[in-house]
């Protein structure tokens, strides 16, 4: 039985993560945290998630309950994640990171921390999206430079970063398969008189509206035909179940930086 700590247990994703842990027979809810100074400190994490009492009182500092869990699941903010990584390095705990919006410098710090503790870092924990990555690599390699590539993503109005971490990862996979550097070929939105499309660019378009859980489409278009590969998530539980699967896989493995491709055996 793997004991899991949920960070941000009172948030939209946190509540779903608590439910996913409680629903998995191989996992148990070991700890739950909320914001520092929150009025929910001491409240039962199960009751916050609408599941009834689970016997786990929320804390605002996981360092207080280090003996109560084996793996952390975090879908909060880059700043919070880096603080948790420092704790994991010190205590030898494993962590599953679904947080997005990291800068290149923050990603470097994350990779350094993974030298001392096991880390699964993936912008999208769903099985479907991770299968999509493999499909995209094959498609991009086969089609090559004759096809224009556009990545279109849509999320709810509350999402703070754009493009989404998943969209950027989709773009990275396509760029790598085509022998390009995404940092050099990405175009984020278009406005005004832009001139003809540069053949080797990868375009990104972002939609933020309503309660859209997450939709991603990669378009490969040339003269005469267009291929669109799409993934649509209709529930956050899709991501939560993937995160719990990652936590179960991560428990007991050697320190290192892993992703969902490792968890799912797709590499």
UniProtKB/Swiss-Prot annotation:
List locations, semicolon-separated.
Answer: Cytoplasm
Provide one Gene Ontology cellular component.
cytosol
Can the keyword Glycoprotein be found in this entry's annotation?
A: no
Q: Which residues bind (S)-2,3,4,5-tetrahydrodipicolinate?
A: 156, 165-166
List UniProt keywords, sorted A-Z: Amino-acid biosynthesis, Cytoplasm, Diaminopimelate biosynthesis, Lysine biosynthesis, NAD, NADP, Oxidoreductase
> A biological process (GO) annotation for this entry?
lysine biosynthetic process via diaminopimelate
Q: Which reaction does it catalyse?
A: (S)-2,3,4,5-tetrahydrodipicolinate + NAD(+) + H2O = (2S,4S)-4-hydroxy-2,3,4,5-tetrahydrodipicolinate + NADH + H(+); (S)-2,3,4,5-tetrahydrodipicolinate + NADP(+) + H2O = (2S,4S)-4-hydroxy-2,3,4,5-tetrahydrodipicolinate + NADPH + H(+)
Q: In which pathway does it act?
A: Amino-acid biosynthesis; L-lysine biosynthesis via DAP pathway; (S)-tetrahydrodipicolinate from L-aspartate: step 4/4
Q: Where does NAD(+) bind?
A: 8-13, 98-100, 122-125
| Similarity field | Belongs to the DapB family.
Protein name, per record: 4-hydroxy-tetrahydrodipicolinate reductase
Q: Coding gene?
A: dapB
